[in-house]
């Protein structure tokens, strides 16, 4: 099953991993939150915190604003301002635009890696990614 497969990959690469309490989850709020955090130059820190909460700590609540607001606060961002920004029209439009661009490019799942005109999908395709990068 999928959870067993995730555990195998984590063991192989000696990564901290806990099966999330909720899996899979709706990620649109977290994605909009990441876009919103650009306003505070905290986008990457926010993404890292979400990733750690979900995959390392098994926290299945990262799709909920209560949890996302806590993460924003730990990064020094006012939680109310964060949620307002994440729900704003421009942030929603940017996520829709980014999603449409990914679909037009041929992305159909996560993880997907685009190099030049090629799309590589799945964690088990990293050798192909390495081969492609070596040819550049």
What are these model-derived regions, one by one?
Residues 1-57:
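Structural alpha/beta surface segment adjacent to cysteine/selenocysteine redox centers
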Residues 49-136:
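C-terminal cap of thioredoxin/glutaredoxin-like
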């Amino acid at each position: 099953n999928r959870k067993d497969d995730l555990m195998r990959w984590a063991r192989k690469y000696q990564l901290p991993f806990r099966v999330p309490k909720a899996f899979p989850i709706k990620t649109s709020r977290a994605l909009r939150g990441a876009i919103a955090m650009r306003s505070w130059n905290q986008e990457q820190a926010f993404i890292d915190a979400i990733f750690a909460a979900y995959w390392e700590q098994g926290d299945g609540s990262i799709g909920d604003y209560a949890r996302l607001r806590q993460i924003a606060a730990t990064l020094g961002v006012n939680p109310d301002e964060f949620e307002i920004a994440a729900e704003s029209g421009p942030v929603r439009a940017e996520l829709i635009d980014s999603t449409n661009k990914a679909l037009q490019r041929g992305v159909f799942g996560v993880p997907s890696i685009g190099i030049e005109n090629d799309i590589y999908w799945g964690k088990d395709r990293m050798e192909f990614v390495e081969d492609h990068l070596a040819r550049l």
